[in-house]
Curated annotation (Swiss-Prot):
Activates KDO8N (a required 8-carbon sugar) for incorporation into bacterial lipopolysaccharide in the Shewanella genus. One of its GO terms (molecular function) is 3-deoxy-manno-octulosonate cytidylyltransferase activity. Belongs to the KdsB family. CDD domains: CMP-KDO-Synthetase. It comes from the Bacteria. The gene is kdsB. This is 8-amino-3,8-dideoxy-manno-octulosonate cytidylyltransferase. It is found in: Cytoplasm. Coiled coil: none annotated. GO terms for cellular component: cytosol. Its EC number is 2.7.7.90. It comes from Shewanella amazonensis (strain ATCC BAA-1098 / SB2B).
Amino acid sequence: MNVTLLIPARYGSSRFPGKPLAPINGKPMIQHVYERAALAKGLNAIYVATDDERIKDAVESFGGKVVMTGADAASGTDRIEDAITQLGLADDDLVINLQGDQPLIDPISIEQIVELFRRHPGEFEMATLGYQISDKAELDDPKHVKMVFDNDMYALYFSRACIPFGRDVSEYPVYKHLGVYAYTRRFVHTFNSLPLGRLEDLEKLEQLRALEYGHRIKVAISAFDSPEVDTPEDIRRCENRLKVD
């Protein structure tokens, strides 16, 4: 099975312009993401998918590979499809979509999501990761997307609200979504051909489109958290974590 990992990265974030190039312990964030992904076993290639020459130059300066995408990509998945079309991937090739703002991603988590497809060929078209919440402050924080899944580890729903709801969740595990996806090249095209979902539009969560149109998402629970960098304040937390790692 051919496995290509793509890291979509854009410069023009409204909350944090230039985020992929933000320095973390002396390296641009995109370099941390790329280098941690490169430690994962079982990948055939890694590319940063971007439309920005500054990001391209930064990635190439540390020896990374880049595929330039169009500036009109409406979403990360649109950028992914543009990239895999340029790369000429086959329909059954596996694509890993790792967000460019996850400098703390553990390579074992990437291996875990690849292994799902190796163990269950043809059973599903899309997979993702979850992590059990230990910080109660994250339960009601819409920045941390919560998820529920069935007994066979297929996603039932994703929400910015706390799900499942309970008057006392202290002894009930609640899981958050980690922004790593795996899918076949064929399914990326299928996904992008679907109209915007109502729930997707309401929650502003792209993965809900797959569920709304009846596509199953397999879930693996990671032992490692991978917090995303959304604001400059998150950089300091990442720096402290990386020093410990």
